[in-house]
Amino acid sequence: MSCERKGLSELRSELYFLIARFLEDGPCQQAAQVLIREVAEKELLPRRTDWTGKEHPRTYQNLVKYYRHLAPDHLLQICHRLGPLLEQEIPQSVPGVQTLLGAGRQSLLRTNKSCKHVVWKGSALAALHCGRPPESPVNYGSPPSIADTLFSRKLNGKYRLERLVPTAVYQHMKMHKRILGHLSSVYCVTFDRTGRRIFTGSDDCLVKIWATDDGRLLATLRGHAAEISDMAVNYENTMIAAGSCDKMIRVWCLRTCAPLAVLQGHSASITSLQFSPLCSGSKRYLSSTGADGTICFWLWDAGTLKINPRPAKFTERPRPGVQMICSSFSAGGMFLATGSTDHIIRVYFFGSGQPEKISELEFHTDKVDSIQFSNTSNRFVSGSRDGTARIWQFKRREWKSILLDMATRPAGQNLQGIEDKITKMKVTMVAWDRHDNTVITAVNNMTLKVWNSYTGQLIHVLMGHEDEVFVLEPHPFDPRVLFSAGHDGNVIVWDLARGVKIRSYFNMIEGQGHGAVFDCKCSPDGQHFACTDSHGHLLIFGFGSSSKYDKIADQMFFHSDYRPLIRDANNFVLDEQTQQAPHLMPPPFLVDVDGNPHPSRYQRLVPGRENCREEQLIPQMGVTSSGLNQVLSQQANQEISPLDSMIQRLQQEQDLRRSGEAVISNTSRLSRGSISSTSEVHSPPNVGLRRSGQIEGVRQMHSNAPRSEIATERDLVAWSRRVVVPELSAGVASRQEEWRTAKGEEEIKTYRSEEKRKHLTVPKENKIPTVSKNHAHEHFLDLGESKKQQTNQHNYRTRSALEETPRPSEEIENGSSSSDEGEVVAVSGGTSEEEERAWHSDGSSSDYSSDYSDWTADAGINLQPPKKVPKNKTKKAESSSDEEEESEKQKQKQIKKEKKKVNEEKDGPISPKKKKPKERKQKRLAVGELTENGLTLEEWLPSTWITDTIPRRCPFVPQMGDEVYYFRQGHEAYVEMARKNKIYSINPKKQPWHKMELREQELMKIVGIKYEVGLPTLCCLKLAFLDPDTGKLTGGSFTMKYHDMPDVIDFLVLRQQFDDAKYRRWNIGDRFRSVIDDAWWFGTIESQEPLQLEYPDSLFQCYNVCWDNGDTEKMSPWDMELIPNNAVFPEELGTSVPLTDGECRSLIYKPLDGEWGTNPRDEECERIVAGINQLMTLDIASAFVAPVDLQAYPMYCTVVAYPTDLSTIKQRLENRFYRRVSSLMWEVRYIEHNTRTFNEPGSPIVKSAKFVTDLLLHFIKDQTCYNIIPLYNSMKKKVLSDSEDEEKDADVPGTSTRKRKDHQPRRRLRNRAQSYDIQAWKKQCEELLNLIFQCEDSEPFRQPVDLLEYPDYRDIIDTPMDFATVRETLEAGNYESPMELCKDVRLIFSNSKAYTPSKRSRIYSMSLRLSAFFEEHISSVLSDYKSALRFHKRNTITKRRKKRNRSSSVSSSAASSPERKKRILKPQLKSESSTSAFSTPTRSIPPRHNAAQINGKTESSSVVRTRSNRVVVDPVVTEQPSTSSAAKTFITKANASAIPGKTILENSVKHSKALNTLSSPGQSSFSHGTRNNSAKENMEKEKPVKRKMKSSVLPKASTLSKSSAVIEQGDCKNNALVPGTIQVNGHGGQPSKLVKRGPGRKPKVEVNTNSGEIIHKKRGRKPKKLQYAKPEDLEQNNVHPIRDEVLPSSTCNFLSETNNVKEDLLQKKNRGGRKPKRKMKTQKLDADLLVPASVKVLRRSNRKKIDDPIDEEEEFEELKGSEPHMRTRNQGRRTAFYNEDDSEEEQRQLLFEDTSLTFGTSSRGRVRKLTEKAKANLIGW
């Protein structure tokens, strides 16, 4: 104990000393002096012990000197070190926090024992503290067993949720079933209020009802004509509402599935739907927001379920393009908060009995796309794309917020690796936990952040997702649990309390990659949660057994799901074939995705078929005209009525008549009087990786399906009594209603009390404005209604996130664009209602094309006219508010009074009952009314301004892509003139200058053109703002309509014309001339003044001029031209002079670079004119050659506003009418557009017009095509083959399993054994590309993007890539590895997402699915490739070891006879070759039948070997280009003469030597075509060097190598080459020849020079430097590469020879699987030589390194990039090269082919020879 006490006292003394040192060095100097004095007095400092053991006290100064190695802050350093050291042993609870004051696991005194988890006994669990169970300690261990918890609850009647249900329980949730129930992506899923039913809403326009407990498909709700954007179930569980991109809301009764209402109050897509929790008697509200910037509140009665069709409507659109995209009700329903794209949050209040807007919160700086009210209070959280979220609460008469910045990082955690990759943080989703204590935000860096909702403090960062997260779903009663899902296919269950992952699920779809999860919901009881994905699946998760789900099929569709519907005037639907409401049809049959019926055991799962007999469960099958099996009707005993038989027979006859047509009409003609002729529901293209052009059987079943049996009255009564979704029990419903009522009253009370409280003093700019409820009842239509508008919010979003536009056009609301010109919405502009309605009418040029708009949605402006006509559009949803009805009636009266005004030019909306679904038919009706009133059809003819074919300066004719200056003053004058003359109805208040700030002149770009039939014909333009400096779009636009009117000056001026005039300087008195009516008129400038004083800088009509005839007028500078010296003046003053043809040509537009492609305009026009001439000779184009005969078709001009034809286009091309090729293509498309407008869809002439248009467009785009006939033939064959393929696909009979295989591309590339072929990846990638080309999703990515159609593509995408380019590169063999191919394919997907970042677009979804599909398949290819590399590496090492082991044990007697028989290998006859860029041509030499004599002895030619393959000398010499990439040349000395009597093989070698002889110095050293006789004679004089080197590459007699040399620099100091000697083991003799250095030796150099001087080298002297040289340098130094030759064998060094080899053969043979290196590295040394890369120089110091195993990473790189290595048998003792693949016999043959083997020469010049005894001893190598 005394020792311990002594040790403690010593530590205490040292601590006092360190404290004093620390204080003395810090700011507490006085405290330090006091401490030093006190410790000295009490002798508390460390003591000194002398040699006798006595202790002596020390002073402080003495200790400082003694411990001078200690820094003053030594104590602080100790404290710094303690924490990390302890952390390694016992980790603390919060990593990264360093403190000396912590407790528990943060304490520096913690031990393993103190950190152990506490476990309570049963008595502690049963205890109560303040009437409730006590809190568990922080270090509480695993939760107690459920038995202990239940027993404690039984004793005390209380429990804590974390004890009763620990989060570990959620690990037992598993996926019960994944069901394919839709053909497209499913963005919406929700549970009913009981949790027993699941609803899914998909892009295939269907809403389906599923049973939660067993996964059965119970019902399908049909009626929508576009994608489902949002769904909501009311709190009473009696009805479901679904919003769609067709601008309608459909409401169904959940009990019977009967439709209750079709609500039409929006003019654009529905973005969110919410049933209000508000309870005010039986009065309830349904709210809806739309992309048109409006919010509607629909009043309905809870008792009768009747909905008022006239909503209370608020238009929140301060500028065009603003969309309301999300909404959320408070718990009591008294508040509704909405988010929109104008960054404003709007709050509505219901406390007064009617909805009223109370606040507009403009604190976010980007769009607010996620919003959510808390579960129990009046707080809500908003998430924005500006990277922040805000928690709002109403206090002191204003909404106050807590800022949550997504850039915040938690203390102690380093997230830089993730967050640094994201340039701008964006909130993608927000949510509350169940108790509202925390707010969860999803960020675009794939993380979730958990915040304290009261303080805004960041609590946790949850990481686990690999892509953006758009689904956050809190548990319904457990505040610790959150579900999240995203586009990465992961569904993760989180523990919010601990910030850890509980369980994750990955939605992997076999053969298709992963499916992005688009929505997720949890059932009210928390027992299940359901997810939907991008491939149409419903995923059901839950606790317990999955046995019930095993009884259902994996694919569940009803055979009637996609049958066509007919609509009445109110948009209610009937099944077209049965003429019955869908909910009254007989129970359908269950089929798979191909339309094949499921077995009878599955049919019993259909409601209504549970008790059917077996024969009634077997559907009657038929075959459609396309060969598809389909369900005809159920097999019933009742007889078919005669009327049914007749109808069925007539329908079959009609189907037979239609079957000859390629396109089936989309319109359905009905015989029922109450049903108007409407369009069939057009389903979006199927999603999923199906073959291109293939249609799912279940979707195709409606094409010719006979009518099912008509239900009897008894059936109708029975079906009307069925209950699909049960209502809530009375007790539960009343209890929930009471709770909601109480919450509502509480919210009103809180709001009223806060309203009375005084403001706190806040800065003026922070005050939140409040706006009255009458704020914005004037509403504006959106600039377009996109079919792909998929942004919708529940309290959170169910569809993908809104688009992101990082380009300058950030404000462009592309989702609302439906025109093919790529509309751009003004940032601060507007457009009138009638203009927008006209812009989107069927007669316009802006017909919808979903594919087209997907590509251009976020890319800016597209200059192309429409490609396709839409499927017949449903009627436009109109407002039905009282105020709008009043204004509508007045406007209708006004229109009736003005008989000359066109019907579609009404200022107000049209009554739903009077407006026809087709705008085209409405126009025909209007024409009929007008002709009855005395108007003639001639008045409907378009003016010459439209039909003119000659380009004119005035009037201005707009063309697509024109850059123009817009002059507001001129437009105002036009509007005033049109109103004054009552030409047509025009509302000046809705002109663009009332909607936005317009300067006197604006630079614009024409991005949309359409012509409108009427009196007069109007031109509707869409103009986008241009930046005059950059020439790029700034993001704003507006629309306008006008026509050429006499006495109205053009207010649109071409930019080129304006720029030319701007730089002219006109002075008063200057003479000018101007073009008016194709003639020159002359005048004089009198003065200059602005037209209007408010626009002093405007050039519009700023000059006062006097014409020569005396008239005065105001003129603009661009209308005036300088008078040239050679001008022709009129004979009489005041008259005009006609323009000449030359003058006309000089005044027309001069095209800019690229506007006509790569060719000049004249050349392109002549080429296209020639093509049109050829096209006009074809029969298919006969209908479009000349203008339509108006005598035969008098109504044509009343339907078609802009007539055109091939002859008109040709004439305009000849006159250079078109200013750019996009303008021409726009008009070409109008041929098809006009044909489609006037004729019935699907008619032969419409198909012909489409073919002619596509043919001509292809011809125009291909600027290398000068003959259109071959293109016509190929397109015709393609059309025929496509139709045949479709029929062939449909004709495949068989079971559902077989048909599934036939219709689906193979999902697995291979099911074979592991391949170890390094080149196998090429075949696998080729199969994968073929598979991708079969997928429909790959269609946009198969060919390069057409830059004419998407001119801004290269502005956004730096490196375009497509699958055709990838395939060509692969076939050409330009990919070195599958990693390179993988990089290019991933570039395709990244380009797609960059150009079309809108996550709701079809292109984006296709990219997601195809990317997942590719990644799944390429992973196996990459794995096989790496496995093959590893296998080859291991195999190489094994062979080396085996050869060493065998060589060490070979008997010497095996080679006792050096004269043994030599083997002559059979020549290889492989003839494939590939020529590199550096190849040198060779000349073929006929073979000579002579035998080679080597060293005086006739021998067979020895076989030259490569590193891994046998080398065969081909006796047949053919002309082959040499591949210099493989050729490395060496300077060697050889025999140059041919000796008669030698063998063919030796002759071949002889010829190769002769061909490789260099010419004279004046000639190229690489010219193999001629022989150099002088060089030959020279070399014959020299004594042959009796040494042999093996070739490092495979030689052939026909492929001759270049020469390269390795020179060893000796003692010479000059840069010239010096003579040397053959260096063998340090000895020299003959003039040096180039010798490749072998392992274990330094390089030996042989150099031929003209000098006879011989410089000897000392034994063992090492070379100083190595040099790489160019062939030219060799030639300049008179060093000639010598011919390739097989030299005699030597026991020491073998000269390595190289020959040019075919590249493909080299790739096949080389061990590394890689082409030879093509780069030659150069260094500056004394001599310029070439070092062969195929032979590696080894030294003694590194000879053992090769024998050591190489790790896999090094091996991978070596095999990919390095050349073969040469090795030696003797490991440095001798330098005889060998290859490790050589067999023992081959090595002996190579080594001992001659008895007179030499070692070169000694230092004295004597030849060193190997004796017989030594030669026999060498056999054991």
UniProtKB/Swiss-Prot annotation:
Entry's Gene Ontology BP terms = cytoskeleton organization; insulin receptor signaling pathway; negative regulation of apoptotic process; negative regulation of extrinsic apoptotic signaling pathway; positive regulation of cell population proliferation; positive regulation of DNA-templated transcription; positive regulation of insulin-like growth factor receptor signaling pathway; positive regulation of mitotic nuclear division
Mark out the compositionally biased spans (Polar residues).
1470-1483, 1555-1576
Major localisation:
nucleus
InterPro entries assigned to the protein according to its UniProt record, in alphabetical order: Bromo_WD_repeat, Bromodomain, Bromodomain-like_sf, Bromodomain_CS, WD40/YVTN_repeat-like_dom_sf, WD40_repeat_CS, WD40_repeat_dom_sf, WD40_rpt
Q: Which SMART domains does this one have?
A: BROMO, WD40
Which part of the chain holds the cross-link Glycyl lysine isopeptide (Lys-Gly) (interchain with G-Cter in SUMO2)?
A: 421, 1470, 1644, 1670
Phosphothreonine modified-residue sites: 1359
Q: Which Gene3D superfamilies match?
A: Bromodomain-like, YVTN repeat-like/Quinoprotein amine dehydrogenase
Which parts of the chain are coiled coil? none
The reported result of mutating residue 110 to C is: In CHUJANS; uncertain significance
Where in the numbering of this chain does the Bromo domain appear? Answer: 1156-1263, 1316-1421
What does the record give under GO molecular function? insulin receptor binding; lysine-acetylated histone binding
List N6-acetyllysine occurrences by residue: 1497, 1533
Composition bias of kind Basic and acidic residues appears in 751-767, 775-788, 800-810
Cellular localisation: Nucleus
What function does this protein fulfil?
A: Probable regulator of the insulin and insulin-like growth factor signaling pathways. Stimulates cell proliferation through regulation of cyclin transcription and has an anti-apoptotic activity through AKT1 phosphorylation and activation. Plays a role in the regulation of cell morphology and cytoskeletal organization.
The cross-references to PANTHER family, in alphabetical order and at most eight, read:
PH-INTERACTING PROTEIN, WD REPEAT DOMAIN 9
This protein is called: PH-interacting protein
Species of origin reads: Homo sapiens
Q: What taxonomic lineage is listed for the species of origin?
A: Eukaryota, Metazoa, Chordata, Craniata, Vertebrata
